[in-house]
Curated annotation (Swiss-Prot):
It comes from Haemophilus influenzae (strain ATCC 51907 / DSM 11121 / KW20 / Rd). SUPFAM superfamilies: P-loop containing nucleoside triphosphate hydrolases. One of its GO terms (molecular function) is ATP binding. ATP binds at residues 29-36. One of its GO terms (biological process) is sulfate transmembrane transport. Gene3D superfamilies: P-loop containing nucleotide triphosphate hydrolases. This is Uncharacterized ABC transporter ATP-binding protein HI_1474. Residues 2-199 form the ABC transporter domain.
Length: 199
């Protein structure tokens, strides 16, 4: 369970909410409202006041690299000189070939395992980035509009696959999005930010 209490940054003002294990929360709001700042605070990338607890443990005591969280945004950060397999190995060296194949198969890109990022379409690259985020079986998945650069058809295809993976693996998820349809598809629970405040 994630509990955010009186979170404040240079943008956010007294933000409080909670998410149950395996729940998906959508965060909506205009550009500049603090959505990305919220994810950065939870990930441990920026300083803040207030408290963030994960499974009753104060996150301030754990540096970002010790948190089993994965952050995915529009910047895919795929290593261009590594194949799909190579990118997965860098994300989780202990993952077996079978684990890689199963995950890529679920994402419908197992046939691309030996290709390089420049040989993939935008939608395929997004799926590889998802695979890299999920290969470590994260406790918390932070999604910052990762599909906004895709056309609607590609976006909806990925929605279906990702929602199934999240539900099957019971991954707690926070999704930042501008799209009401996307928020509604992924979760029944939403919060809205406006000028750094919950409304």
């Amino acid at each position: 369970m994630l509990i955010v209490q009186n979170l404040q940054t240079n943008i956010l003002k007294s933000i409080s909410f909670s998410i149950e294990k395996s729940e998906c929360l959508s965060v909506v709001g205009e550009s500049g409202s603090g959505k990305t700042t919220l994810l950065n605070a939870i990930a441990g990338y920026i300083d803040y006041s207030g408290s963030i607890l994960w499974n009753n443990q104060v996150l301030e005591n754990n540096p970002p690299w010790k948190r089993n969280f994965r952050y995915l945004n529009q910047r895919l950060y795929l290593f261009p000189h590594k194949t799909v397999r190579g990118n997965l190995i860098l994300a989780n060296p202990s993952a077996s070939d079978a684990e890689q194949q199963i995950l890529l198969s679920e994402l419908k890109i197992d046939h691309l395992i030996n290709r390089y990022p420049h040989q993939l379409s935008g939608g395929e690259q997004q799926r590889v980035a998802l695979a890299r985020a999920l290969i470590y079986r994260p406790d918390l998945l932070l999604l910052d509009e990762p599909f906004s650069s895709l056309d609607w058809s590609s976006r909806k295809d990925i929605w279906k696959v990702l929602k199934n993976l999240i539900q099957t693996n019971e991954i707690t998820t926070i999704l930042v999005t501008h799209e009401p349809k996307e928020a509604e598809y992924f979760s029944g629970k939403q919060i809205q930010l406006y000028q750094g405040q919950l409304i």
